[in-house]
């Protein structure tokens, strides 16, 4: 016997929730299951998903998860309680990420050639002042404080505590070699002004955090940092995933690097 599907979950107050900074937080299928004949997939996925769904409904107040963009068949969830007007149905919402196919870039110079002009301009100018930065070791408190400075309006006092735990957990994954962190300080002030954090899977590198202070952001440090990541992982992974592009400003920013849209689904019950 072999495990064909596993499903990580986080439970808070008997509710299935998606942790901050995580995408595609849902079922993972083995290669054996995914490579089976098409005529078998619907039956297999139906049987497996049904067992999970029945367990979740019985044990949790709410169900909330996301499917990876390679799993676009959501019929099993759409058919749950099909035709029963008095029964609860799954809510299925389309979401998008932005990805860059690193294997299509035969040489590194092809990476920046797909950037929007303003990004290329920012990077060119930022290189002239990048000597004012110095690499540094990561520090959880400093990273948390810098992130909160840019996103404080999103988090209540209670949520800020959870946020710090979430950032600590992601850093813990990096320290277990599931990712990498890059941090830079201003040489004059010796303060952290920029960091990025990526996590790895077998084929992809995921941009989980990309953060700078407001003054350095205006100078183009974010574009400089992303360009550095794309060059570093060119030839090492198939895909660079920006992990979500679901608001007008962030979507436009991520696609300005030549990323293509990837549809995935968020499903609730």
Protein language model regions, located:
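A conserved beta-strand-loop-helix scaffold within acyl/acetyltransferase catalytic domains
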Residues: 1-15, 69-217
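Conserved acyl-donor/pantetheine-binding loop and adjacent beta-alpha core of acyl/acetyltransferases
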Residues: 11-26
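A short, internal acetyl-CoA/4′-phosphopantetheine-binding micro-motif in the GNAT/acyltransferase core
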Residues: 23-40, 209-218
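Conserved acetyl-CoA-binding loop-helix of GNAT-fold acetyltransferases
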Residues: 38-54, 217-231
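Long, mid-chain structured domain cores
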Residues: 45-57, 61-64, 71
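Alpha-helix C-terminal capping segments
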Residues: 55-59, 126, 133, 174, ...
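Conserved GNAT acetyl-CoA-binding A-motif
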Residues: 58-69, 233-243
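Aromatic (often tryptophan-rich) hydrophobic motifs at membrane interfaces
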Residues: 172, 176-269
